């Protein structure tokens, strides 16, 4: 299987690109095992310096596959992409007291391989699938009529209120009313205190003094 994949593949490489391999691998991991069309879209929308380098390299690999090997561009997949360390350029930055700090300018080597992978058609995928038995339809259950429940008797916790019947007022006879009116002034006269006559006492005192 591996030999078949490599026999229908094309490669492209570029060396000594002025970029750190650690930063370039971040973009390379995005397109690994992706189709060629998906990889192109990812690289065009990724805002990284390495995306421009890898995009040119991928277009070169696709052109090699279609022109040199006669492969179908729609079936190409990025089966391998490598980013290796290139030669490091050493520079120095001068500092005070005669000191010099080193500067390492790293470079990277890129390698990419695209292979033609024949994806199984829809008919092959359906033929391999086992035919599932049709699911049994559940038998319709006969629903029993719902029995009417007897209403619950509510037990009231309130105590029964005793109603006192008001007795009807007895109307007095007109004769009794007149007798009551006559009796009232007589009773009022008896209640009034009788004033003693002071004239008699004064006259007796005067007679005694004489």
UniProtKB/Swiss-Prot annotation:
InterPro entries: Ribosomal_uL22 (IPR001063), Ribosomal_uL22_bac/chlpt-type (IPR005727), Ribosomal_uL22_bac/org-type (IPR047867), Ribosomal_uL22_sf (IPR036394). Residues 126-157 have a biased composition (Basic and acidic residues). Residues 123-210 are annotated as: Disordered. GO terms for molecular function: rRNA binding; structural constituent of ribosome. Residues 158-185 have a biased composition (Low complexity). GO terms for cellular component: cytosolic large ribosomal subunit. One of its GO terms (biological process) is translation. The keyword rRNA-binding applies. Keywords: Ribonucleoprotein, Ribosomal protein, RNA-binding, rRNA-binding. Pfam families: Ribosomal_L22 (PF00237). The keyword rRNA-binding applies. It comes from the Bacteria. Belongs to the universal ribosomal protein uL22 family. Part of the 50S ribosomal subunit. HAMAP family: Ribosomal_uL22_B. This protein binds specifically to 23S rRNA; its binding is stimulated by other ribosomal proteins, e.g. L4, L17, and L20. It is important during the early stages of 50S assembly. It makes multiple contacts with different domains of the 23S rRNA in the assembled 50S subunit and ribosome. This is Large ribosomal subunit protein uL22. It comes from Metamycoplasma arthritidis (strain 158L3-1) (Mycoplasma arthritidis). The gene is rplV.
């Amino acid at each position: 299987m591996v030999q078949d994949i490599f026999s229908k593949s094309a490669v492209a490489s570029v060396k000594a690109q002025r970029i750190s391999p650690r930063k370039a691998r971040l973009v390379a991991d995005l397109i690994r095992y992706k189709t060629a069309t998906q990889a192109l879209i990812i690289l065009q929308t990724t805002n990284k310096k390495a995306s421009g380098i890898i995009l040119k390299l991928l277009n070169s690999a696709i052109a090699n596959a279609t022109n040199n090997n006669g492969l179908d561009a729609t079936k190409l997949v990025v089966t391998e992409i490598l980013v290796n360390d290139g030669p490091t350029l050493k520079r120095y930055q001068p500092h005070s007291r005669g000191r010099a700090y080193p500067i390492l300018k790293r470079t990277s080597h890129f390698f990419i391989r695209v292979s033609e992978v024949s994806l199984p058609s829809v008919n092959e995928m359906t033929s391999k699938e086992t035919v599932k038995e049709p699911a049994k339809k559940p038998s319709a259950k006969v629903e029993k009529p719902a029995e009417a429940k007897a209403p619950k008797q509510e037990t009231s916790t309130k105590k029964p209120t005793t109603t006192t019947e008001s007795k009807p007022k007895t109307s007095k006879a007109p004769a009794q009313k007149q007798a009551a009116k006559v009796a009232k002034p007589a009773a009022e006269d008896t209640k009034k205190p009788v004033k003693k006559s002071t004239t008699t006492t004064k006259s007796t005192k005067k007679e005694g003094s004489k």
